[in-house]
């Protein structure tokens, strides 16, 4: 049976979703400290840098194997290594991208994703002007080859950047081909069967939140 995908389906049930969303903030900050040669950092300093309460930082870090020392804090090098591993950034994941329009093409151009453990192995589209081309060294195929290439390349992550009207049908094709996790950039809440992970990243929703908050500005 299909259900509307909930973002929490992505998350480790042992770790609260807000915690998982904050951990990359901490990682970014301690990476800067590490680059500057800093050896230790307190939860108070981390909290001040990212704009949260120090007790929240300590609680969040209790879910990962980072040990802090009284009056010393956390070893920066250890935090960088542990957080990178815990968040999956040190592991190699391969993905296919579906919908090579302006957003999809931009993601294909973003080599920085590799630094977070994600390699986009191929793109898929139906536009004859795009199919059988390469973007940033990444081949673009017709979507009719999805099942064949998923099996051959053993890819189980899909990035969905198609127009909204095609979102559900493309998601269905992706899942039928063997995709087990979908990073959904469309504003459509796709329905998926049990056992398929979905992470919704709608820029339009974030834009709406920003516009709404701007209304309260003086």
Swiss-Prot record:
Q: Which GO terms describe its biological process?
A: negative regulation of DNA-templated transcription; response to redox state
Q: Which GO terms describe its molecular function?
A: DNA binding; DNA-binding transcription factor activity
Which residue ranges does the Swiss-Prot or TrEMBL entry mark as DNA-binding? 25-64
Q: Which residues bind NAD(+)?
A: 99-104
| Record-linked Pfam families | CoA_binding (PF02629), Put_DNA-bind_N (PF06971)
Q: Name one GO cellular component term.
A: cytoplasm
Q: Which InterPro entries would you find in this protein's record?
A: CoA-bd (IPR003781), NAD(P)-bd_dom_sf (IPR036291), Rex_DNA-bd_C_dom (IPR009718), Tscrpt_rep_Rex (IPR022876), WH-like_DNA-bd_sf (IPR036388), WH_DNA-bd_sf (IPR036390)
Places the protein is found: Cytoplasm
Where mainly found? cytoplasm
Record keywords, A-Z: Cytoplasm, DNA-binding, NAD, Repressor, Transcription, Transcription regulation
SUPFAM superfamilies, sorted:
NAD(P)-binding Rossmann-fold domains, Winged helix' DNA-binding domain
The UniProt subunit note reads as follows:
Homodimer.
Belongs to which family? Belongs to the transcriptional regulatory Rex family.
**Protein role:** Modulates transcription in response to changes in cellular NADH/NAD(+) redox state.
- Name this protein carries in UniProt: Redox-sensing transcriptional repressor Rex
| Lineage of source species | Bacteria, Pseudomonadati, Bacteroidota, Bacteroidia, Bacteroidales
Q: Which gene encodes it?
A: rex
